[in-house]
A protein has these predicted regions:
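Primarily marks hydrophobic transmembrane alpha-helices of the MFS/SLC 12-helix fold
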Residues: 67-74
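Helix-to-loop junctions at the C-terminal end of transmembrane segments
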Residues: 53-66, 152
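Hydrophobic core of transmembrane alpha-helices in multi-pass small-molecule transporters
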Residues: 12, 93-110
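Symmetry-related core transmembrane helices of the 12-TM Major Facilitator Superfamily/SLC fold
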Residues: 159-171
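C-terminal ends and interior cores of transmembrane alpha-helices
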Residues: 75-90
């Protein structure tokens, strides 16, 4: 696969996964009976852990190639999605906390590594193409939100929906 296509695919998958999760937050809130404050507290942990994931990915990229890290971290996002669905189905708060931590760490580390790869592609091509990668992310976020909305309308469980997303997005 050509480097630009591969990095575009990484941005696309990340946008789709993120929007799929965010669009289904009301179902998670309903399943657990979270108040607005409780939900805000749970969700605040995701970007905090994502920041940790970004820093760790940056540190590890010195030792391993960012493409290798990107593949591994994308698996964390997929696992986080599936575990989020399973936690919601089982109404297990400890499992949900673990799932959101996996998602946060995975999202942050994927963000860092896919941007590292994007910079590499720019150097390879000799011109700026980062905006096109972010456009793929945005398109995927729209499609992910639409897919999540359609899944909610058909009563597909979170576990079922997130499992499909995980299988499709992680090659």
């Amino acid at each position: 696969m050509q480097p630009r296509v591969a990095v575009s695919a990484a941005f696309f998958c990340q946008g789709f996964a993120f929007a799929s999760l965010i669009t289904r937050i009301p179902a998670i809130q309903e399943a657990f009976g979270f108040s607005e404050g409780q939900l805000a507290l749970m969700l605040a942990a995701v970007p905090i852990v994502a920041g940790v994931g970004s820093v760790v990915a940056g540190t590890l990229a010195v030792r391993w190639h960012s493409a290798v890290l990107l593949r591994g971290c994308a698996v964390l996002v997929a696992i986080g999605l599936v575990v989020t669905g399973g936690a919601t189905t089982a109404q297990s708060l400890p499992l949900l906390i673990l799932a959101l931590a996996l998602m946060g760490f995975g999202l942050g580390s994927v963000d860092a590594t896919m941007n590292m790869q994007g910079i590499g592609v720019q150097h390879l091509l000799g011109r700026s193409v980062m905006a096109s990668f972010h456009a793929w992310w945005s398109l995927a976020a729209i499609l992910g939100a639409l897919a999540a909305s359609a899944a909610a309308a058909t009563s597909l469980s979170l576990l079922g929906f997130f499992a499909v997303i995980a299988v499709v997005l992680v090659p």
